[in-house]
Regions:
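C-terminal helical "tail/cap" subdomain of flavin- and related membrane-associated enzymes
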Residues: 297, 312-346
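Short FAD-binding loop at a beta-strand-to-alpha-helix junction that anchors the flavin cofactor
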Residues: 277-294
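Conserved N-terminal glycine-rich FAD pyrophosphate-binding loop of Rossmann-like flavoproteins
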Residues: 38-58
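Conserved N-terminal helical subregion
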Residues: 2-5, 55-172, 180-188, 241
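Glycine-rich FAD pyrophosphate-binding loop
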Residues: 25-45
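Conserved FAD-binding catalytic core of PHBH/FMO-like flavoproteins
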Residues: 140-153, 158-268, 272-277
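N-terminal Rossmann-fold NAD(P) dinucleotide-binding loop
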Residues: 17-18
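Beta1/beta-strand and adjacent pyrophosphate-binding region of the FAD-binding site
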Residues: 2-14
Length: 346
């Protein structure tokens, strides 16, 4: 059986892959999405959409869906000292080309909306891959996969690696990576904070030994994040709720919770891969290219920005384009990435 040909195949259907597919939905280009994942994205994560990116999401046609899914508005960021005294409030930047507030919504809901929009626009999405391989032939990429006891194959002119921090595409093609791991892990708690106003804010407390962030989650809940020493990890994982309340009250005077539970420990990492320099048309995006964890949704908003810029770079192509046509566009895109985005991610 002859493998179906696509203009673009994207390995990874998370935020980055979904965002690029949606950004391309009116381009006329055929897109294939492939992912090992069969369930939702990380349900423990909540993402905050920057005001400056909301016009982009409106142009993609997904803003109304995000609001219908329960996205809530957040005002600025409030800073407090170790005694709980207010230092300053950083307001939301105002301008004609940005939203009036941050929007926050669970990570998996944003991903589901992007994927549903992509599929409605004609993209082919295949999930639950148990195995896949990548080869080159006659100016194309060839992808073979196994999913649910069925095999499949496709060819594409351009390949996009959007398969996360531990990118398999990057590993298989031996693309260099610059990674920096930070000294202290980040502990995350989840709870329902008392006295939260209808106008949610991100609150940061500058305690004596650490910075504690109280991050709004949908439904009136709050995510608490702070660095911990490795020897303290056991405390946060095993101590009863009352102990968590007492410790947090020491760091954030005047803050109290109706409920508070341990969530997770995250090892902070910042990494950037080199652009692909080998044979064929390939580009890395999302965490496969630039990862910052945890980073208060900077990674997701950067995904949106990069997807929009890459889609704009490909706008001049028609379906059936050749490798010779797309390679100069990818070179221009990488140069723009280096000039505009690399300083933001440094």
């Amino acid at each position: 059986m002859t493998a179906r040909h696509f203009d673009i195949a994207i390995i990874g259907s998370g935020i980055a892959g979904g965002a690029l597919t949606v950004a391309l939905k009116d381009s006329g280009l055929s897109v294939l999405l492939l992912d090992r994942r069969s369930g939702p994205l990380d349900t423990a994560r909540g993402d905050h959409i920057q005001p400056v990116m909301q016009p982009v999401l409106s142009r993609w046609g997904v803003m109304d869906q995000l609001l219908e899914a329960g996205a809530e508005r957040r005002a600025g960021t409030r800073w407090f000292d170790a005694e709980g005294a207010h230092i300053v409030t950083v307001p939301v930047p105002q301008g004609e080309d940005c939203g009036g507030a941050f929007l926050f919504l669970n990570h998996e809901k944003i991903g589901d909306i992007l994927l549903a929009t992509a599929e409605q626009a004609g993209a082919v999405n295949i999930a639950g891959l148990s195995d896949w391989s990548l080869t080159r032939a006659a100016g194309n990429w060839c992808v073979d996969w196994q999913a649910a006891e069925q095999s499949g194959s496709a060819t594409c002119t351009m390949l996009v690696a959007a398969d996360g921090t531990a990118s398999t595409v990057r590993s298989r093609l031996k693309i260099s990576l610059d990674r920096h791991r930070y000294q202290y892990p980040i502990a995350v708690l989840y709870g329902r904070q008392q006295g939260v106003s209808d106008e949610r804010t991100l609150d940061v407390y500058l305690a004596q030994e650490r910075m504690v962030s109280l991050i709004p989650r949908t439904g009136g809940r709050t995510k608490v994040g702070f660095p911990v020493s490795p020897e303290d990890i056991g405390f946060w994982k095993t101590e009863p709720e009352e102990s968590l309340h007492r410790r947090l009250t020491e760091w954030c005077p005047g803050v109290s919770f109706d409920s508070l539970t341990f969530g997770a420990i995250y090892p902070p990492v910042s990494q950037q891969s080199e652009p692909y320099q080998g044979e064929g048309a390939l580009v890395l995006i999302g965490d496969a290219r630039h990862a910052m964890h945890p980073a208060r949704s900077m990674g997701m908003n950067t995904c949106f920005r990069v997807a929009d810029q890459l889609a704009d770079s490909l706008r001049c192509l028609s379906s059936g384009f050749s490798e010779a046509e797309v390679l100069p566009l990818l070179s221009e895109f990488e140069a723009r990435f280096e000039q505009e985005l690399t300083p933001r991610l440094a």
